[in-house]
Structures are given as structure tokens and as C-alpha cells.
From Swiss-Prot:
The keyword Flavoprotein applies. [2Fe-2S] cluster 2 binds at residues 142, 145, 177, 179. The gene is hxA. The keyword Coiled coil does not apply. The active site is at residue 1295. This is Xanthine dehydrogenase. Its main location: other. Key enzyme in purine degradation. Catalyzes the oxidation of hypoxanthine to xanthine. Catalyzes the oxidation of xanthine to uric acid. NCBIfam families: xanthine_xdhA. One of its GO terms (biological process) is purine nucleobase catabolic process. Its EC number is 1.17.1.4.
Length: 1363
């Protein structure tokens, strides 16, 4: 959306933006101020007059055609929008290149700066070294996140051309990627490094070396992680790196060195923007207009505007006020300007520690530690302490430190300066003691005493990097020479509506002898009184939060004790150390495909679009240039989970300037046209008289701009009559709320087997859902044509044909009038298989009504609210075994939360039942599956499609049986593992069965049992830190379970010049499908890979396509292309015989003049499959992809924090078509699976039924530093695949590795067993997935967690619901 250029605002407009008196006075104050911003963009000067202050930098960039910068979340949490802003740093007076989030940066804030986007540093013809190395290093799959990652690395290199490995490892803490698993990105980035020093992060003033606490079983990380650039090059199949030449970078424009900042004032009816250049000007504004919103980095303000619908009539930008960004060292305190950036504050803290020494510098070490995990680098580059203080967030990481250190806040107004002790600053929730007309000018942070004072800061969150705190704390104590407590501050965030001191605990501690054991116990008891949380406390997690408060103090107490009485018998030294990470590394077996490499097939190579993606030139749906007369759509969504629709009033919305129309069910050709769904047509595009889930579309507002459309949608007034709501599986079971579809598999005689079993064990296993979190949200452009009702649909969909069918339905024409096109997706993972149809249908309805193009790209919160997730599952099981552990029988009821409609839930449940055996033989089995009908968004396909849920239940059963029998779980797996030729419980023979072989290989290659002995020794000597291991096998059936979908078509053209154009039915969504298909065609036709091209996927070139899903697309489309190429080769055979040395150009030329058809339509359908439910007959899958993974983790049992130490993955992918692509799929799937089973927790508001976790702020996919510290991947080799009848004898690899991520979960469970055993608890642990830090902590059985447990009172329920 291009920003509007406004005329100079009139006085009436200004009065609308400010109170009347303030407006008049402000006009008088600012009448001489400038209304023009001047900046440079990619080296070119830009001058803009009277800019709309509501426009973000991202909107401006995309509006002028620089679409390489992407919108991923609109809240600064994913990094897809990262650009670099270069300026003379007001604090250091040096040039600094800051990576920032363009999605939350106001355009008007870049005055006097140089903005650099991904387009500005290189292109496909002349790429930057970063872009080229990332591309050939396989660091880009779907590519939507890639420009942001490129720019984060670019910022690092511009500031430090030879960064350390540690700096590179941490450079991406503000970026997310959903595809790659991060390893290849880090490998490419590390090629720029100069390795020095140990890679461990510093904490609490320590040196940071991993050997300091003797924690590493493998020695210092420095010894294992240092690599030269040459070493890094060997990680890639093609090490032809472009040389990095820092002296050829874009220069900082000379005119900006002498750019003189001028005060700015401009705006419109809605908003006025001021940029003072002196503090005096700022104070004058505040005196006239105390309610003016002060903006430093805009990191919080933009979110308030976007998601909380806050409106600020007047904003004052402080980012360029040098006076507020200075610092000064004094004898006993450091004074910092309150608007200093957090990045600069990190550097200042380093200087302070060096100046004051480690003892007196403890406050600055504490601040620096909190900053290390404070948001991402892009946020820290612009955010400030003043912003933290003014917003008064109860979970701010810095505020507890300021309170605990007795920092003084200096507030200035026009007529006075006020000193406010931080202990008195916070008054209530988001309320402070700051006078309305004052600004936070500076902070005076006292140094600690040279002796006797101890300060530590702590934080626990769901994910280590870029995550808000669950609980944080700053704990300080001052001791006399006799160790009596003379002063104490115990300050916590996340325990109350504001940053709060533990008053009872502080009172108890004061005057006590610190080294007396009774002091610890008494303080813990007092903390229980301070934080007596209720079970239903807002924010939830009552037990966990209480345990963290107690645990932080327990750690602090022993840390201090270790400093003053290192040999005390009361010292629990093992509790002091926190988890640290080494520089991550990994190895791949690059020789795995050597034995069967052909001219093209079997050879490693990058994704063919990788370089376009890295340079920002790859085009996605919303990058398509605006069409003439195009409108933007924004959906009106239900805010109730279950209610009657009483009225929908659009009058106010249609009055908003720029709003054109409203579309709903009345605009469809018939009531029947409103119904959609696959395979059951049980969902409506637009709600009619009732809504059955929050987030259900009611209508769509059309407007000239996205902003106007969003404002219009919010202005639609909907009146409801609420109805009873069912959210969770348990609630659905209790209410018997199920869809009719029921499936079962029965084999053998379970009843008799249970009677004969030595042991019968029963249990319940539960697994949460998972948000797809593709970086590109659902997007669509519907373009009506002038004739015959034709329409062109550009949709971010995995399913062009179904999109075509339903667009035809809602527009009332035949399918031959609709062309559905897809260039590429920014990720899909199943979330765009059916759910993309909803947006396409609504956009098409709107376009048909107004006869104008309609565009819509969902915001992240809208996408999560409407598009569904992986199904949560619940399994109640009973298993019979012999005393030796041989499995005899399994009986299980499996329930899936389908949501408010069925979507693909039936097929998802079917696959879960077929995978509930994993790799184990249950000779007698009866498993049943039901779909729960609830008032949540309809859950849908997600990578694995029910398979991971069934596999998880199998491994949960195996783990619990092993514990019941006190057997080694690794041996129990071997005892019950299928052998070659065995039949599954759905009567399919296991051919080319290699799991036992791979299991043995992984045990040996990972030195599993030797390391397990080391883990046992570690656990024996570490009370509060435990390690665990697991080795998890898998098999995954490849084929659509719906038989008719196992078919594909292709169209291959050979042109006169010998170039080849291929079209097929599959969609490129980052998995490298087009790359593999191009390779197949190039091999078959005997031409170079560069001579073959795939442009797009479209329904007018290949019709009746199956969705790109089920890991079957390479098999299906590959053989269809091969079939077409075979036809062409047969036609060219006579010419090859006549001209054996001719090129394809020569052959095509000759054949054309002989009137030979140089186009061929290929087709393939999977043979010999077709399963009949109920009869348990027929072959369900064409083959099984197999794998084994060994994982090792470390958990902090005091906090629930954890880190993956190592993963060794081996996959059987047959004869790989392209090992680079397959390795990328394996690594990406593993990390996505690790997220599924650990960090990714979806939560719903109990009171409203709306999803709470609807963005990166509170839904945590794994980040760069969540991957295994050692991440090894290999492919099975040196075997024959005698029965594999696929293209190249390759196996599908997209979905199968995802379950391997559960190895981290089961390793955590193993560590928890050790933690519980430490305290004498040996009960069998039934661990719910995901194993979040909360679940890890509350599963421990130590005295601290037991005293922290919060029980629900009668009728009391948890704040959030896990459905």
C-alpha cells in the first residue's frame, strides 16, 4: 500500500488531532517547524513533504515497489521486515548501522538517516556475498524470511566486518525461520567469522567460559566449535563463495554527516507528529499538551495502535534528541539518558563494569544480563529504558533491576526537575508517578558496595531468545562483616499487576544472619505469603510462577553463600549455575548419494530460487503489483465462540473515507454457494444467522487502502446472543459432542491377549496442537476479467484446483472460466491446503460484486484466528505385555479436536490410527478414532497429518511400559521392533525395512551408550541440573489415504532454441519441489539444468491437480514429468539416431520442421494402493519413509529451562534426488517437530473463547539458539531398495522427519525421571506435550515445587484453556 502524500494540514485538522487549546498553542509553537523529511534510500536521496505520520516504513517501501522487505507479523517479532538504518549514533557520535523492524518503524522517524533494504545491497546478477553464500549454502527454502535474515547479517558485518562466531550466533535473535531449521543459515553466516575465544554467553559477571563451572562433558566449547572459513566452506556442496569486500559497501551519504536536524511538525485529521530537536522544545510541547504520546523506538506504541486500537492524536518523537541519549560516570553512580538505545546501554554497561570493577559493577552486569535476552536486536536498536519505565509493564526485564538497585529517576518538566526513587515509581497496573507534563530525562544507577553487597538478575520465559518474561527478578542483599543482612531488595516482575517487592520476605531477611539455614527457610516461607497466587490468576501458570519466585531466591541465596562461605556444608553449589549454550555446529554426510549420482539426479545443489529469495526479487502473492482500480479487503470476524447473530450494522464503517463497500453472504449467487469444505461441505464462507467459533468470517470491508479497510472492519457493529461454548477435548467428551465420522482398526484378538498378559497397564496421553506459522500469511488477489465472468486468482495456496472450484461456485460460473495461479508460497505446511480456500472464496465474491480487483493479505493475528492448526489429540489406552516386555495387545480410544467444522479431520484421525504402532508390532490391536466438535477454529492439515500424534502415543506407551517394568527403554524398543516382512496392524507388509539397521547405526555413530554413562554420572553429581537422552525411530506412510488424490499431471514443452518449459500440478512452498522436478526433466531429456524452467502452477496448464501434500508430490509429479519426457524422447529418437552429437536445440529444430509435436502431457497414478476401512484390507501406503534420531538435552530443574545439547538424525530417503534439498527438509522438519513437542503451546481465553497465542509475542516457534548445539544429519546408504518403485527410487521426505523432533521431548522426559529420582519419586511420569518450561518444572518433585503447588478451589478454573 503506497502512503498518501498529504497537503499541509488546516487548522481544523490540527484541532481534531489535539484538544482545542493545546492545538492553538501547538500551532503557535510549531508554526516555523519544517514539514519535510529528508533521508537516503539505498544511496538515493528522498524528500517527502507532509507525510502521513501513521505510515510505517514497511508500508512506504512496499508501496514504492521495494517488496523484498516482507510483512510477517506487524509486531516486530519475526524479523521478516528487517532493514538497516544507518545514522550518526547520538550516543557514541560514530556511524552505526542498525537493523530495525520496518513493520513498526514510523516512516517519519527516518529523517536524516540512510535506509538500506535487501534490494540495495545486491541482485541476482550482482549479489552481495551474504546473499550468494546464504543461497548456495541452502539457507533459504520458502524464502519469505530470507531478506530479513540477510539484512540482520548485513548490519552485523557493516559494524564489524570480521565478527566472532559468538556475535554471528546471536545476530539473528530477532529473526525467525519456519523452514530451514537454521543450521544452514548459521553455517553460511559463520563463513564470515574470525573465531576467537570461548563461545559461551556471559551471565552474572562470569567470564562466560563453559569450563568455568566444569559443565561441559566435551570440554571447552572453544575447542570443538572453532572453524576457519575454509572449514565452513566444506559444509557446502558448492564452496564457490563470493569474496566479501567491506570497502565496496554502500557509503554513508556525505551530506548526512553534516545533516542538520530541524524540528518537524506535520499530520492530518487523525494524527499530528512532532519531532523536536532540543529538550526545551520537547518540554514546551509537554507543557501545552501533557497527553501527547512520547515515542522513542515505537516498539510498544505501534503494537498498541495495531492490536489494541489505541489512538494518539499527537505524538512526539524523541529518537533524535541527543541530550536524552548521553551517559556519564560518577564516583558512585552511572547516569544514563533515559532514551539511550538498549544496544548502546549494553555497551555502556560493559564500560561501567570495566570502570567500577566486578563487585561495584554488579548492577550493570545485571542489566546486561537482562538485555541479552531482551527482545531481538532489531528492537534493542531502537527501544529505550524510558519506554520500559513509561509503559510500566509488569513483566519488563529492566524495571526490577532499576528498583532493586535503588535507581533514581530524574523527571523534567518545563519549570522543574524532580527526582523519583524507583522504589516509589510504579503505582499500579500500567500506572506510574511520572507527572503528566514531565518526561523521563535520565536514570542514576548507583554502584554496588565494594564489599558485602550482592545483586543478581533472573528471567524465565517460554523461549530463551526474544521472549517476554513469565517471571523475572532482581535480588539484592547487603551484608555486614558478620554476614548480618543490613539491606535487602527482592523485586519481581510477572507476579503482580506491577513490578513488586516481596515485602514480607524483605522484612523477614532484614537483620537476620544470612548464613543461618533458618534464614533461607524463613525467607522462602515469607515469599509464599508475598505471592499467594490463586489458581485462576490472570496470565495463568500459578504454580509455575510461584515456584519461579521461590526458585530464583533459592538460587540467589546459594550464589551469595558460595561467595562468602564457599565451603559451607549448607551450600548447594549445583543450584547456582544456569544453562549456557556453546556455539552450535553440525555435520552432514555429503557422500551419502555418491554411489548413485547421475548426470543431474542425485547431485547436491541449492534451491533454484534461493538467490532470488536472498536478493528480495522472488515474488509472492502480495508482491504482485497493484492492479488498476484495485481494492483492499479486510474481514469482519466474529468475536464470540458460539452465538446467534442478531444484527450486523455497517453504517459507521461505510462512512469512513476510503471505504467502498461491504460484502457478505447476501452477495453470493445462492445460499448453496455459501457452503464449502473438503471432503464434507459443512462450513460457510460467511456466517448467516449464527457463529460457531471466534474468528469466523461474517463479512468483508472493501476500501482503497489496507488501513482504511482495517478501520472499516473494526467499525462494523455486530450484536450477538451468546450460546454455550465447548473448547477442549475433555469438554467435548463430557458433552458427547462429536462429528459422525468414526474409524477403527482391529487385528487379532485383543480380549484374549489381555487375559493372557502378565501385565496390563493403562494410561492417558495428551498432545497439544501447533500453529503453522508460515512466515507468509494467507494472501489472495482476485482479478475479474471483462468477459464471460472470467476471473484470475492469485492465491497463496497448496491447492489451486480446489481454489478454482470454489471460486467458480461463489461467482456462479463454470470452472473453465477461473484460472487459479501460484508462483510460490512463503511456507505452507498443510495450512494452505484447504484453509486458503476461505480467503480466496471471500475475495472472489467481493471482486465479482464490485467488478474490481480485490487484494487481501491477512495480518498474523487474523491468520491464526481463522486458519486452524494441527489437531490436539487425546488418547486413552490399555496395553498388555509379558514380564519380559513383549507387547501383546493394545486397546485405545483416540480423540482429535476437530474444531467447529470437519475440514480434513477425518483423514487426520485415520492416519493417527494407522501410525499408532510406530515401528512396533502389536499382534492384537483395537484402536478407535473420534473427532470432537468444539467451538474453536477448524483444525486442519499440518505436516504429518495425524501421523505425529499416533507416533507420539506409541512412544509414550513404550516409555511408560518400560518404566512400569523397570526395563531400559532402548532395549524395549529393540525387543518389539518390526522385522523385514512383518505385517502392520493394517495388514501391510514392510518392504525395504531398514529401521532396525538404522537404529543400530545411530546407536554406534552417536556413541549413544557411552554418552548415556556420562549422562548418568552428570546426573549423579548435579542435583538441580539433569541431562536426558532418547533414541526415537519412526516410519511414515507415503500416499494420500484418499485414493483418488494419488494422481498427477504434467505438461512439457520443448522450444526451438532447445529450452524446456515444464508445468506440473505441484506447488513450490519452499520444499524444493520445482528444483527436483527441473532436475528430473533435465536428466530425462539430457539437457543442462539451466535449460529447464518452471514458471508457476496454474489450473489452465495442468488441470485437476491434487493438493501439494502428503509428502507425495515429488513421487506423483516427478513421474508425470518423466512420463511426458519419455514421450518426447520417443518422438526425438529418430533424430538422435541420425544426429548422435546434436544438442536439443538441433533436435528440436529438425523435429519441428518435420511437424513433430514438441509438447507432451504426462500423467501418473500410484499403483497397487487402496485400503478399505472396516475390512482392514488393501494396501494403505505405497511405501514407508523411515528414520531414527538420538537426542540429548539438559534441563534446569529449578526453573524448567532447557537446552538441546545434541541430535543425531539418520533418514532413509531412498536414492535422493538432491541431497541438499533433502537435508534441508530433514533439518527443518526436525526443528519444527522439536517446537511441536516443546515450545509451541496454543492457549485460548476461557472467558471469550478467542485464541490468545496469535502472534510471535506469545506463540513461540524455535529460534536460532533453540537448535541442538551439535546437530548431525546423515542419510542411509549402502543398501538396495529392491521394492521401491518411485522416481530415482527416492522416498518422500517432507513430513516423516518431523516426528524425529519428539526425541527432544523424550530426552526431557528421561531427564525428568532423573530429577524425580533425586527426590525419591519413582512414579511413572505421564508427560503432556508440549514439554514447555512450565510442564518441565511442575513435573519435578523437589521440595520447592511441592510447596509452590497451587490447588484449585471449588469451581475455580485455569485462566487459559489448552484445547
Amino acid at each position: 500500500m503506497a502512503p498518501g502524500v498529504l497537503l499541509q494540514p488546516s487548522q481544523s485538522e490540527l484541532e481534531a488531532a489535539s484538544p482545542p487549546k493545546a492545538a492553538a498553542s501547538l500551532l503557535q509553537l510549531t508554526e516555523e517547524w519544517d514539514d519535510t523529511i529528508r533521508f537516503y534510500l539505498n544511496g538515493t536521496k528522498v524528500i517527502l513533504d507532509s507525510v502521513d505520520p501513521e505510515i510505517t516504513l514497511l508500508e512506504y517501501l512496499r508501496g514504492i515497489g521495494l517488496t523484498g522487505t516482507k510483512l510477517g507479523c506487524a509486531e516486530g517479532g519475526c524479523g521478516a521486515c528487517t532493514v538497516v538504518v544507518s545514522q550518526i549514533n547520538p550516543t557514541t557520535k560514530k556511524l552505526y548501522h542498525a537493523s530495525i523492524n520496518a513493520c513498526i518503524a514510523p516512516l517519519v522517524a527516518v529523517d536524516g538517516k540512510h535506509v538500506i533494504t535487501v534490494e540495495g545491497i545486491g541482485n541476482v546478477k550482482n549479489p552481495h556475498a551474504i546473499q550468494q553464500r546464504l543461497a548456495i549454502g541452502n539457507g533459504s527454502q520458502c524464502g519469505f524470511c530470507t531478506p530479513g535474515i540477510v539484512m540482520s547479517l548485513y548490519a552485523l558485518l557493516r559494524n564489524d566486518p570480521k565478527p566472532s562466531e559468538h556475535a554471528v550466533e546471536e545476530a539473528f535473535d530477532g529473526n525467525l525461520c519456519r523452514c530451514t531449521g537454521y543450521r544452514p543459515i548459521l553455517d553460511a553466516a559463520q563463513s564470515f567469522t574470525s573465531p576467537i575465544g570461548c563461545g559461551k554467553a556471559r551471565a552474572n559477571g562470569g567470564s562466560g567460559c563453559c569450563m568455568e563451572e566444569q559443565k561441559g562433558t566435551n570440554g571447552c566449547c572453544k575447542g570443538s566449535s572453532e572453524e576457519t572459513t575454509e572449514d565452513v566452506k566444506h559444509k557446502f556442496a558448492s564452496p564457490d563463495f563470493i569474496e566479501y569486500k567491506p570497502d565496496t559497501e554502500l557509503i554513508f551519504p556525505p551530506s548526512l554527516w553534516k545533516h542538520e536536524l530541524r524540528p518537524l511538525a506535520f499530520g492530518n485529521k487523525r494524527k499530528k507528529w512532532y519531532r523536536p530537536v532540543t529538550v526545551q522544545q520537547l518540554l514546551e510541547i509537554k507543557s501545552i499538551h501533557p497527553d501527547a504520546k512520547l515515542i522513542g523506538g515505537s516498539t510498544e506504541t505501534q503494537i498498541e495502535i495495531k492490536f489494541k486500537q489505541m489512538r494518539y492524536g499527537a505524538s512526539v518523537y524523541l529518537g533524535d534528541l541527543a541530550e536524552l541519549r548521553q551517559f556519564a560516570f560518577h564516583d558512585n553512580y552511572l547516569e544514563i539518558g533515559a532514551n539511550i538505545s538498549l544496544t548502546d546501554l549494553e555497551s555502556v554497561c560493559d564500560q561501567a563494569i570495566e570502570r567500577y570493577g566486578s563487585a561495584r559493577g554488579q548492577p550493570f552486569a545485571a542489566i546486561k544480563k537482562q538485555l541479552r535476552y531482551f527482545a531481538g536486536r532489531q528492537i534493542r536498536n531502537v527501544a529505550s529504558p524510558a519506554g520500559n519505565l513509561a509503559t510500566a509493564s509488569p513483566i519488563s526485564d529492566l524495571n526490577p533491576v532499576f528498583v532493586a538497585t535503588n535507581t533514581t529517576l530524574v523527571a523534567r518538566s518545563l519549570d522543574k526537575e524532580t527526582e523519583i526513587p524507583m522504589t516509589q515509581f510504579f503505582r499500579g497496573y500500567r500506572s506510574t508517578a511520572l507527572p503528566p507534563d514531565a518526561i523521563i530525562s535520565s536514570l542514576r544507577i548507583p554502584t554496588a558496595s565494594e564489599k558485602g553487597e550482592y545483586l543478581r538478575a533472573y528471567k524465565q520465559s517460554k523461549r530463551k531468545d526474544d521472549d517476554i518474561a513469565i517471571v523475572n527478578a532482581a535480588l539484592r542483599v547487603s551484608l555486614s562483616s558478620s554476614n548480618d543482612v543490613t539491606s535487602v531488595s527482592l523485586v519481581f516482575g510477572g507476579m503482580a499487576p506491577l513490578t513488586v517487592s516481596a515485602r514480607n520476605a524483605e522484612a523477614f531477611l532484614t537483620g537476620k544472619k544470612f548464613t543461618d539455614p533458618a534464614t533461607l527457610e524463613g525467607t522462602m516461607g515469607a515469599l509464599e505469603q508475598d505471592f499467594n497466587l490463586k489458581f485462576g490468576v490472570p496470565g495463568g501458570m500459578a504454580t509455575y510462577r510461584k515456584s519461579l519466585a521461590l526458585g530464583f531466591f533459592y538460587r540467589f541465596y546459594h550464589d551469595v553463600l558460595s561467595q562468602i562461605e564457599a565451603r559451607s556444608s549448607d551450600l548447594d553449589n549445583s543450584v547456582v549455575a544456569e544453562i549456557e549454550r556453546a556455539i552450535s555446529t553440525g555435520e552432514k554426510d555429503n557422500e551419502a548419494s555418491a554411489a548413485y549420482q547421475q548426470r543431474v539426479l542425485g547431485r547436491a545443489g541449492p534451491h533454484l530460487s534461493a538467490l532470488k529469495q536472498a536478493t528480495g526479487e522472488a515474488q509472492y502473492t502480495d508482491d504482485i503489483p497493484a492492479q488498476k482500480n484495485e481494492l483492499y479487503g479486510c474481514m469482519v470476524l466474529s468475536t464470540k465462540a458460539h452465538a446467534k447473530l442478531l444484527s450486523v450494522n455497517t453504517e459507521a464503517a461505510l462512512e469512513i473515507p476510503g471505504v467502498i463497500d461491504y460484502v457478505d453472504h447476501k452477495d453470493l449467487p445462492s445460499p448453496r454457494a455459501n457452503w464449502w469444505g473438503a471432503p464434507n461441505c459443512d462450513e460457510v464462507f460467511f456466517a448467516v444467522d449464527k457463529v460457531t467459533t471466534a474468528g469466523q468470517p461474517i463479512g468483508m470491508i472493501l476500501a482503497n487502502t489496507a488501513k482504511a479497510a482495517e478501520e472499516g472492519a473494526r467499525a462494523v457493529k455486530v450484536e450477538y446472543e451468546e450460546l454455550p461454548v465447548i473448547l477442549s477435548i475433555e469438554e467435548a467428551i463430557e458433552a458427547q459432542s462429536f462429528f459422525e465420522r468414526f474409524r477403527y482398526i482391529k487385528n487379532g484378538d485383543p480380549e484374549s491377549a489381555f487375559r493372557d498378559a502378565d501385565h496390563v497397564f493403562e494410561g492417558v496421553s495428551r498432545m497439544g496442537g501447533q500453529e503453522h506459522f508460515y512466515l507468509e500469511t494467507q494472501a489472495c488477489v482476485a482479478i475479474p476479467k471483462a468477459e464471460d465472468g472470467e476471473m484470475e486468482i492469485w492465491s497463496s495456496t497448496q491447492n489451486p484446483t480446489e481454489t478454482q472450484s470454489y471460486v467458480a461456485q461463489v461467482t456462479g460460473v463454470a470452472a473453465n472460466k477461473i484460472v487459479s495461479r501460484v508462483k510460490r508460497l512463503g511456507g505452507g505446511f498443510g495450512g494452505k491446503e484447504t484453509r486458503s480456500v476461505q480467503l480466496a472464496g471471500i475475495c472472489a465474491t467481493a471482486a465479482a460484486k464490485v467488478r474490481r480487483p480485490v487484494r487481501c493479505m491477512l495480518n498474523r493475528d487474523e491468520d491464526i484466528a481463522t486458519s486452524g492448526q494441527r489437531h490436539p489429540f487425546y488418547c486413552k489406552w490399555k496395553v498388555g505385555v509379558t514380564r519380559e516386555g513383549k507387547l501383546l495387545a493394545l486397546d485405545a480410544d483416540v480423540y482429535a479436536n476437530g474444531g467447529h467444522t470437519q475440514d480434513l479431520s477425518g483423514a487426520v484421525v485415520e492416519r493417527s490410527l494407522s501410525h499408532i504402532d510406530n515401528v512396533y508390532r502389536f499382534p492384537n490391536i483395537y484402536v478407535r478414532g473420534r473427532i470432537c466438535k468444539t467451538n474453536t477454529v477448524s483444525n486442519t492439515a499440518f505436516r504429518g497429518f495425524g501421523g505425529p500424534q499416533g507416533l507420539f502415543f506409541a512412544e509414550s506407551i513404550i516409555s511408560e511400559v518400560a518404566d512400569h517394568l523397570d526395563l531400559q527403554v532402548e532395549q524395549l524398543r529393540i525387543l518389539n521392533m518390526y522385522e523385514p516382512g512383518d505385517m502392520t496392524h493394517f495388514n501391510q507388509e514392510l518392504k525395504d525395512w531398514h529401521v532396525p539397521l538404522m537404529y543400530d547405526q545411530v546407536l554406534q555413530e552417536s556413541e549413544y551408550f557411552e554418552r548415556r554413562k556420562a549422562v548418568e554420572e552428570y546426573n549423579r553429581t548435579h542435583k538441580w541440573s539433569k541431562r536426558g537422552m532418547a533414541i526415537i525411530p519412526t516410519k511414515f506412510g507415503i500416499s494420500f489415504t484418499a485414493l483418488f488424490l494419488n494422481q498427477a499431471g504434467a505438461l512439457v514443452h520443448i522450444y526451438h532454441d532447445g529450452s524446456v518449459l515444464v508445468a506440473h500440478g505441484g506447488v513450490e512452498m519452499g520444499q524444493g519441489l520445482h528444483t527436483k522436478m527441473t532436475m528430473i526433466a533435465a536428466e530425462a531429456l539430457g539437457v543442462p539444468l539451466s535449460d529447464v524452467f518452471i514458471s508457476e502452477t496454474a489450473t489452465n496448464t495442468v488441470a485437476n491437480t491434487s493438493s501439494t501434500a502428503a509428502s507425495a508430490s515429488s513421487d506423483l509429479n516427478g513421474y508425470a514429468i518423466y512420463n511426458a519426457c519419455t514421450q518426447l524422447n520417443e518422438r526425438l529418437k529418430p533424430y538422435r539416431e541420425k544426429m548422435p552429437n546434436a544438442t536439443l536445440k538441433d533436435l528440436a529444430h529438425a523435429a519441428y520442421f518435420d511437424r513433430v509435436n514438441l509438447s507432451a502431457q504426462g500423467y501418473y497414478r500410484t499403483p497397487d494402493i487402496g485400503y478399505t476401512w472396516g475390512e482392514n484390507k488393501g494396501q494403505m501406503f505405497f511405501y514407508f519413509t523411515q528414520g531414527v534420531t538420538a537426542a540429548e538435552v539438559e534441563i534446569d530443574t529449578l526453573t524448567g529451562d532447557w537446552t538441546p545439547l545434541r541430535a543425531d538424525i539418520k533418514m532413509d530417503v531412498g536414492r535422493t534426488i538432491n541431497p541438499s534439498i533433502d537435508y534441508g527438509q530433514i533439518e527443518g522438519a526436525y526443528i519444527q517437530g522439536q517446537g511441536l513437542f516443546t515450545t509451541e503451546e496454543s492457549l485460548w481465553h476461557r472467558t471469550t473463547g478467542q485464541i490468545f497465542t496469535k502472534g510471535p509475542g506469545n506463540y513461540k516457534i524455535p529460534g536460532f539458539r533453540d537448535i541442538p548445539q551439535i546437530f548431525n544429519v546423515s542419510l542411509l546408504k549402502d543398501v538396495e531398495w529392491e521394492n521401491l518403485r518411485t522416481i530415482q527410487r527416492s522416498r518422500g521426505v517432507g513430513e516423516p522427519p518431523l516426528f524425529m523432533g519428539s526425541a527432544a521431548f523424550f530426552a526431557i522426559r528421561d531427564a525428568l525421571k532423573a530429577a524425580r529420582k533425586e527426590w525419591g519419586v519413582t512414579d511413572v511420569l505421564s508427560l503432556v506435550s508440549p514439554a514447555t518450561p512450565e510442564r518441565i518444572r511442575v513435573s519435578c518433585a523437589d521440595p520447592i515445587i511441592e510447596r509452590a503447588r497451587v490447588k484449585a478451589e471449588e469451581g475455580e478454573k485455569s485462566f487459559f484453556v489448552a484445547i
